[in-house]
C-alpha cells in the first residue's frame, strides 16, 4: 500500500480502526506485503513496497506451492512414527509373509462369525477383518450358527402379510 504526501494527514481513531479492518479483511495485515530495494538517481538505496497485485500474485504462488497433495508415504516417515497396537491395521514398510486370514476361505474357522473368538490372542501381520462375511448369496442352507454360537434353523420361505 503506497501513500502520497496528500494522504499523510492525521487520522482519527475511527478511520484507523476502519483501515485496520479493511487490511485484515483483505488479508494484507496478516501476510505483510514484501518490500523491494530500489536505487534512486543519486545511488542511495530505498525500500519500495510492491504493488498490491504483485503481492497477491506472490501469496497465491506461495499458497499453491505449500499445499501440494501427498502422493506416497516415505518409509522413513513410518520409522519415525510411534508404533501403536491396533486390532485392524499395522503400518509397516515390509510386505506380509502370508495373506491375511480373511482371504483363506479353505479354513473352516473363517466360515462363521464365531471364528473371531477363536482368532483372539493370535497375532497376525497385515490386514484384519472387521467382520467375517461371504461375498455370495447362500440359498441351500437349512441350518446355521448364530452370533452366540447356537444352532438355528434357516427358513426356506418367509410369509408376509395376512394369510
Swiss-Prot record:
Protein name: Neurotrophin-3
Keyword terms of this UniProt record: Cleavage on pair of basic residues, Glycoprotein, Growth factor, Secreted, Signal
Pfam families: NGF, NTF3_N
Functional note: Seems to promote the survival of visceral and proprioceptive sensory neurons.
Propeptide segments, given as residue ranges: 4-119
Lineage: Eukaryota, Metazoa, Chordata, Craniata, Vertebrata
Signal peptide: 1-3
GO cellular component: a single term: extracellular space
Residues glycosylated per entry: 112
One GO BP: negative regulation of neuron apoptotic process
PANTHER family: NERVE GROWTH FACTOR NGF -RELATED, NEUROTROPHIN-3
Compartment(s) of residence: Secreted
InterPro entries in the cross-refs: Cystine-knot_cytokine (IPR029034), Nerve_growth_factor-like (IPR020408), Nerve_growth_factor-rel (IPR002072), Neurotrophin-3 (IPR015578), NTF3_N (IPR045815)
Native source species: Eryx johnii (Indian red sand boa)
A GO molecular-function annotation: growth factor activity
Family: Belongs to the NGF-beta family.
Amino acid at each position: 500500500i503506497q501513500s502520497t504526501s496528500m494522504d499523510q494527514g492525521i487520522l482519527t481513531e475511527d478511520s484507523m480502526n476502519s483501515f485496520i479492518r479493511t487490511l485484515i479483511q483483505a488479508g494484507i495485515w496478516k501476510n505483510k506485503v514484501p518490500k523491494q530495494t530500489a536505487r534512486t538517481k543519486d545511488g542511495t538505496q530505498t525500500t519500495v513496497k510492491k504493488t498490491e497485485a504483485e503481492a497477491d500474485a506472490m501469496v497465491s504462488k506461495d499458497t499453491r506451492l505449500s499445499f501440494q497433495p501427498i502422493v506416497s508415504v516415505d518409509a522413513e516417515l513410518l520409522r519415525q512414527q510411534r508404533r501403536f497396537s491396533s486390532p485392524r491395521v499395522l503400518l509397516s514398510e515390509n510386505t506380509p509373509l502370508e495373506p491375511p486370514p480373511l482371504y483363506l476361505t479353505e479354513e473352516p474357522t473363517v466360515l462363521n462369525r464365531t471364528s473371531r473368538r477363536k482368532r483372539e490372542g493370535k497375532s497376525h501381520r497385515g490386514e484384519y477383518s472387521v467382520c467375517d462375511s461371504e461375498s455370495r448369496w447362500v440359498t441351500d442352507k437349512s441350518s446355521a450358527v448364530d452370533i452366540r454360537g447356537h444352532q438355528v434353523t434357516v427358513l426356506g420361505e418367509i410369509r408376509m402379510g395376512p394369510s
